[in-house]
């Protein structure tokens, strides 16, 4: 089977995507698959470069990759692809829409406000959230242009920085707690990982640099584990995820809050999903096998 590993792209996470893609190409079982690296440099590359492949394994991150656009093109071309479909991908990429759906489904998430310009900043509402707050692009990943803002005076600059990457900016309540992540594959939760960033929060340097954070499988107390699993699977279902995704949470005073959902989690040597899979003795190669196998069974009609 010719498996095109699609990486690169046009988002701010291009370099991370290439790291993921190269890791995947090297890990794929050579006896089962002919791995074909497909590096996208511009949108127009996609249709030409996927010709002749039997399956698209997506190692893209960010806009035009994780947002449902590439999935829509592949679906139109009749090429099976890995992971979530166009709708779920688009919803999970939009942090505001994700949180609206979670709130509708009574899944706990941090409070937030949205702005499209500095003129829309409502300092009274931000005061109500309580400082510090996170300021981040609405559509974006890997914590690119995400700032932990300690005071009213710093809000405007943080919003301007985030607006360089998106037309909408989220101002989110800061919940000081323990960060965990819940990888899900085929509707089942893998071992939960704890994330202990060396800096103030799990930023881009922590996520992809060596030693930027301690990440390890964590044994939660029984009641908390049950609630985390229930929330993670409910989130996966509410957002119509398919095959695999990663649900990020914060736990404060034994109460979990959903942060966001990654529909194309990183697949580098430092990535969380492979670390979690290793906790049930699933190798990186076996994880990719499972993703391909389960993705081929999804009805994309």
Swiss-Prot record:
**Predominant localisation class:** cytoplasm
Which protein are we looking at? D-alanine--D-alanine ligase A
Q: Which InterPro entries match?
A: ATP-grasp, ATP_grasp_subdomain_1, D-Ala_lig_Van_CS, D_ala_D_ala, Dala_Dala_lig_C, Dala_Dala_lig_N, PreATP-grasp_dom_sf
Enzyme Commission designation: 6.3.2.4
Q: Which GO terms describe its biological process?
A: cell wall organization; peptidoglycan biosynthetic process; regulation of cell shape
Q: Fetch the PROSITE patterns from UniProt.
A: ATP_GRASP, DALA_DALA_LIGASE_1, DALA_DALA_LIGASE_2
Which of this chain's residues are annotated to bind Mg(2+) 2? 260, 262
- Which prosthetic group or cofactor does it need? Mg(2+); Mn(2+)
Q: What residue ranges are annotated as transmembrane?
A: none
Where in this chain does the record put each ATP-grasp domain? Answer: 99-293
Give the keywords, sorted: ATP-binding, Cell shape, Cell wall biogenesis/degradation, Cytoplasm, Ligase, Magnesium, Manganese, Metal-binding, Nucleotide-binding, Peptidoglycan synthesis
What terms describe the molecular function in GO for this protein?
A: ATP binding; D-alanine-D-alanine ligase activity; metal ion binding
Give the pathway listed in the UniProt entry for this protein: Cell wall biogenesis; peptidoglycan biosynthesis
Q: How is the cofactor bound?
A: Binds 2 magnesium or manganese ions per subunit.
Which residues are listed for ATP binding in this entry? Answer: 126-181
Q: What does this protein do?
A: Cell wall formation.
Where is Mg(2+) 1 bound in this sequence? 248, 260
Organism equals Clostridium perfringens (strain 13 / Type A)
């Amino acid at each position: 089977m010719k498996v095109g590993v699609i990486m690169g792209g046009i988002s701010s996470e291009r370099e991370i995507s290439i790291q993921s893609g190269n890791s995947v190409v090297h890990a794929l079982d050579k006896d089962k698959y002919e791995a074909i690296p497909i590096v996208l440099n511009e949108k127009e590359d996609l249709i030409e470069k996927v010709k002749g492949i039997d399956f698209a394994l997506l190692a893209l991150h960010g806009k035009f990759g994780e947002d449902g656009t590439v999935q829509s093109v592949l679906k139109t071309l009749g090429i099976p692809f890995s992971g979530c479909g166009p709708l779920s991908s688009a919803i999970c990429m939009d942090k505001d829409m994700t949180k609206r759906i979670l709130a509708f489904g009574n899944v706990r998430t941090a409070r937030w406000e949205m702005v499209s310009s500095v003129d829309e900043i409502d300092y009274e509402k931000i005061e109500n959230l309580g400082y510090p707050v996170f300021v981040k692009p609405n559509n974006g990943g890997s914590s690119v242009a995400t700032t932990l803002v300690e005071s009213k005076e710093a809000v405007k600059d943080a919003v301007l920085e985030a607006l360089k990457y998106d037309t909408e900016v989220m101002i989110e309540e800061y919940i000081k707690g323990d960060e965990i992540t819940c990888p899900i594959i085929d509707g089942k939760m893998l071992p939960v990982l704890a994330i202990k960033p060396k800096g103030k929060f799990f930023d881009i340097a922590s996520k992809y640099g060596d030693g930027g954070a301690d990440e390890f499988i964590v044994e939660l107390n029984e009641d908390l584990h049950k609630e985390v699993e229930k929330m993670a699977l409910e989130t996966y279902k509410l957002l119509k995820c398919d095959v695999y995704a990663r649900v990020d949470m914060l736990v404060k005073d034994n109460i979990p809050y959903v942060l966001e959902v990654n529909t194309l989690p990183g697949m580098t040597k430092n990535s969380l999903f492979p670390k979690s899979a290793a906790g049930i003795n699933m190798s990186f190669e076996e994880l990719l096998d499972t993703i391909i196998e389960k993705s081929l069974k999804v009805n994309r009609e």
